Amino acid sequence: MRLSPVCYSFSRSRTIVLAGVLAVVSAGGTIGCTDVSGSSTSVLSIQFDTLPSPSVVVGDTLRDTTGAVIRPVVHAFNFKGAEILPTPVFFLSPDSGITVDSVTGIVVGDSLRSSPARIVATVGRLQAIQKVNLTLRPDTIFAKNAFDSLVYSISDTTKDVSPMLTVMLRHGVAPNDSAVPFYIVSFTIVSQPDPLLGELVNDGGTAAHVDTTDATGIAGRKIRLHPLHLSSATQVDSIVVNATARSHGAVVKGSPVRLVLLFKPPS
């Protein structure tokens, strides 16, 4: 009896065996799969790696934060789960907003759209998809919430996370400027009393040094304070953060933006 081809997709890394069909899934990418028949040189599944950038600027090529052009990466696997050299990979997009080179996969943004555009990678009969947003060129970056304070607690660490320190990315010149959404901004602590005292975190409390601007062009990071590294239980001081955006590898005008958190004990 021959089993029909089946394909499954999961968000976590794992290997699934179901009804005689093997689906090899890796985090950070989408997959396509088919039945297990064939030799060790036959492609059973493909993985399309997550793109290094969440968006492509209209009128430009999809690039990473260094300014380098992004070439989409597709991996192929045989029925043993081993990576093999695939037959030629072909790329296309069924959506407006981008054009995709069918051979290299290089993406160019040509117009804004309200939803992400799909990039489809095809190897033989297998297909996998990644999505990319369209955005505007960032011309300036400036502080949105440049200064805030944190009343820390020695005993209750849930209180030791600051409000969000934020910046805004804009395209064009005021008053005719526009928000730049879906764009990467990096944050770095450049000054603090102890190198282990504060760390940058996201909304979920996980350490993170980069953020992607929201629909209004705002990005930010919080600071988690580690009281163990205070010089005393009454220390009052500040932590300074720089926020930087890059375009074509060069810093965007206004970078780095200086953000300051004042921390103090309860009064």
Descriptions of predicted regions:
Residues 2-20:
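Bacterial N-terminal signal peptides that target proteins for export
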Residues 28-32:
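C-terminal motif of bacterial Sec signal peptides marking the signal peptidase cleavage site
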Residues 55-60, 92-108, 190-221:
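Low-complexity "stalk/linker" and mucin-like segments enriched in Ser/Thr/Pro/Ala/Gly
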Residues 115-122:
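Append "Rare intracellular matches occur via the same short Y/T/C beta-strand/loop motifs
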Residues 44-48, 90-91, 107, 187:
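An extracellular/luminal cadherin ectodomain-centered signature
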Residues 34-79, 102, 124-180, 192-205, ...:
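Short S/T/G/P-enriched beta-strand
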Residues 108-114, 226-232:
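Short, surface-exposed loop/turn segments at beta-strand-coil junctions that are enriched for proline
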